[in-house]
């Protein structure tokens, strides 16, 4: 999506990106918590779109560049919906919204093939505007109105759209801007920061009002910050589009950091650096709390070292702890005491962030007292890239600043 001739400008403050403030926005100077339910795809929440508002389940996705919603359109025909979709699919019916305006003539038709929504089938969308309603806010938002061009009648998706929270770079038009960013630029949100809490077990769910997580829009809760927040400038690299999330045209809007150190306990592991779009060398930490963010990020070599430490043996699991392409191993759970924490450092600070063994080891539910690693690898050999998601965030507060283009991390105070 982004010609290399202007890559140098991508990390100019996001406030300079093209976003036309609109008078069709309510002003709200507090934050709002999206209540998250964990699913096999990622975290889901209900959001209302249109006038009157149609409340639908959305996948909250740190790695998507806009507000995507399934509509009635099938091969451009709003009356042929179920020629493309399952009859149980929950959809946004744009024909019932008095504020829906199709703006495809202005922005152009959106089309990604391949993509990480439907993989080998194309993701196609018209561009439109409508009122997005979250809490007391209502913002006239540019959205991606899905226009299906393949048959997906076999089953319904458990959500109706994607609430994208990717960073916005200079030159990104509104069709690929996070709806939160559009709302902040329109004055609906006082703060450009969004934050995430993962309430991963029954002991922590009270913090999330009984839900599995909170995605806070417009700030963070200072009472849950233990110590200081460490802020890191993000980097831009096309390597993510090659090794991790493959789109054509390429998508490079990620909350990604330069990973400067990865160690297993005190054993430092080799880094395999790639070239970023400003010419620097970096191993990459990409933040993603959907299904691709499950599992502690490790290198292939690091995974081999963990296997050696506990004498693990290869195993085929019917219900693996994550959907990574790496193999899985089992070992005697008593050997978990031999495992050290995994440690990561990012450019801008020498602070090491840990994933302790109890958060990357899982007991197999087969009554054999066997355990497996919940880890995920990308690439070959040394550490080139890792996805930092819910496994990393179990005991941390993760924040994104849309104005400064920074990732903030703090220990979480329960």
UniProtKB/Swiss-Prot annotation:
<feature type="glycosylation site" description="N-linked (GlcNAc...) asparagine">
    <location>
        <position position="173"/>
    </location>
</feature>
<dbReference type="GO" id="GO:0004190">
    <property type="term" value="F:aspartic-type endopeptidase activity"/>
</dbReference>
<protein>
    <recommendedName>
        <fullName>Aspartic protease-like protein pynH</fullName>
        <ecNumber>3.4.23.-</ecNumber>
    </recommendedName>
</protein>
<comment type="function">
    <text>Aspartic protease-like protein; part of the gene cluster that mediates the biosynthesis of pyranonigrins, a family of antioxidative compounds. The first step of pyranonigrins biosynthesis is performed by the hybrid PKS-NRPS synthetase that condenses 6 malonyl-CoA units to an acetyl starter unit, to form a 1,3,5-trioxotetradecane-6,8-dienyl-ACP. The enoyl reductase (ER) domain of pynA is likely to be functional during the first two rounds of polyketide chain extension, to generate the saturated C-C bonds of the alkyl side chain.</text>
</comment>
<dbReference type="InterPro" id="IPR001461">
    <property type="entry name" value="Aspartic_peptidase_A1"/>
</dbReference>
<keyword id="KW-0378">Hydrolase</keyword>
<dbReference type="Pfam" id="PF00026">
    <property type="entry name" value="Asp"/>
</dbReference>
<feature type="glycosylation site" description="N-linked (GlcNAc...) asparagine">
    <location>
        <position position="258"/>
    </location>
</feature>
<dbReference type="GO" id="GO:0006508">
    <property type="term" value="P:proteolysis"/>
</dbReference>
<feature type="disulfide bond">
    <location>
        <begin position="333"/>
        <end position="371"/>
    </location>
</feature>
<feature type="glycosylation site" description="N-linked (GlcNAc...) asparagine">
    <location>
        <position position="366"/>
    </location>
</feature>
<keyword id="KW-0325">Glycoprotein</keyword>
<feature type="signal peptide">
    <location>
        <begin position="1"/>
        <end position="19"/>
    </location>
</feature>
<feature type="glycosylation site" description="N-linked (GlcNAc...) asparagine">
    <location>
        <position position="202"/>
    </location>
</feature>
<feature type="glycosylation site" description="N-linked (GlcNAc...) asparagine">
    <location>
        <position position="93"/>
    </location>
</feature>
<feature type="glycosylation site" description="N-linked (GlcNAc...) asparagine">
    <location>
        <position position="151"/>
    </location>
</feature>
<keyword id="KW-0732">Signal</keyword>
<dbReference type="GO" id="GO:0019748">
    <property type="term" value="P:secondary metabolic process"/>
</dbReference>
<dbReference type="InterPro" id="IPR033121">
    <property type="entry name" value="PEPTIDASE_A1"/>
</dbReference>
<feature type="glycosylation site" description="N-linked (GlcNAc...) asparagine">
    <location>
        <position position="140"/>
    </location>
</feature>
<dbReference type="InterPro" id="IPR034164">
    <property type="entry name" value="Pepsin-like_dom"/>
</dbReference>
<feature type="glycosylation site" description="N-linked (GlcNAc...) asparagine">
    <location>
        <position position="102"/>
    </location>
</feature>
<feature type="glycosylation site" description="N-linked (GlcNAc...) asparagine">
    <location>
        <position position="221"/>
    </location>
</feature>
<feature type="glycosylation site" description="N-linked (GlcNAc...) asparagine">
    <location>
        <position position="272"/>
    </location>
</feature>
<dbReference type="InterPro" id="IPR021109">
    <property type="entry name" value="Peptidase_aspartic_dom_sf"/>
</dbReference>
<feature type="domain" description="Peptidase A1">
    <location>
        <begin position="43"/>
        <end position="410"/>
    </location>
</feature>
<keyword id="KW-1015">Disulfide bond</keyword>
<feature type="glycosylation site" description="N-linked (GlcNAc...) asparagine">
    <location>
        <position position="335"/>
    </location>
</feature>
<comment type="similarity">
    <text>Belongs to the peptidase A1 family.</text>
</comment>
<comment type="pathway">
    <text>Secondary metabolite biosynthesis.</text>
</comment>
């Amino acid at each position: 999506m982004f010609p290399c001739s202007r890559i140098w400008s991508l990390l100019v403050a996001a406030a300079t990106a093209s976003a036309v403030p609109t008078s069709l926005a309510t002003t709200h100077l507090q934050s709002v918590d999206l209540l998250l339910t964990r699913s096999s795809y990622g975290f889901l929440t209900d959001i209302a779109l249109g006038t009157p508002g149609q409340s639908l389940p959305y996948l909250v996705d740190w790695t998507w560049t806009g507000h995507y919603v399934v509509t009635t359109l099938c091969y451009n025909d709003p009356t042929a919906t179920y020629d493309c979709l399952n009859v149980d699919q929950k959809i946004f019916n744009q024909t019932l919204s008095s504020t829906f305006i199709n703006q495809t003539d202005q922005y152009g038709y959106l089309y990604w093939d391949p993509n990480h929504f439907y993989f080998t089938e194309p993701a196609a969308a018209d561009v439109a505007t409508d009122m997005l309603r979250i809490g007391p806010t209502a913002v006239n938002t540019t959205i991606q109105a899905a226009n299906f061009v393949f048959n997906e009648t076999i089953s319904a998706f458990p959500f109706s759209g994607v609430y994208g929270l990717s960073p916005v770079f200079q030159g990104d038009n509104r069709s690929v801007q996070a709806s939160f960013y559009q709302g902040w630029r329109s004055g609906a949100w006082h703060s450009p920061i969004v934050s995430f809490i993962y309430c991963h077990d029954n002991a922590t769910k009270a913090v999330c009002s009984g839900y599995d997580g909170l995605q806070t829009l417009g700030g963070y809760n200072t009472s849950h910050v233990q110590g200081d927040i460490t802020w890191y400038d993000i980097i831009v690299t096309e390597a993510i589009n090659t090794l991790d999330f493959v789109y054509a045209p390429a998508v490079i809007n990620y909350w990604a950091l330069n990973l400067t150190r990865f160690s297993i306990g005190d054993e430092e592991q080799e880094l395999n650096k790639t070239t970023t779009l400003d010419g620097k060398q970096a191993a990459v930490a990409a933040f993603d709390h959907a299904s691709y963010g499950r599992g502690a990020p490790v290198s292939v070599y690091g995974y081999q070292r963990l296997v050696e430490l506990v004498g693990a043996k290869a195993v085929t699991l019917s219900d693996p702890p994550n959907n990574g392409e790496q193999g899985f191993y089992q070992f005697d759970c008593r050997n978990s005491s031999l495992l050290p924490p995994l440690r990561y450092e990012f450019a801008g600070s020498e602070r090491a962030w840990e994933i302790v063994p109890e958060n990357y080891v899982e007991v197999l539910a087969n009554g054999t007292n066997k355990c497996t690693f919940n880890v995920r690898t990308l690439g070959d050999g040394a550490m080139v890239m890792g996805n930092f998601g819910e496994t990393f965030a179990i005991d941390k507060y993760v924040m994104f600043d849309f104005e400064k283009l920074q990732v903030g991390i703090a220990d979480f105070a329960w």
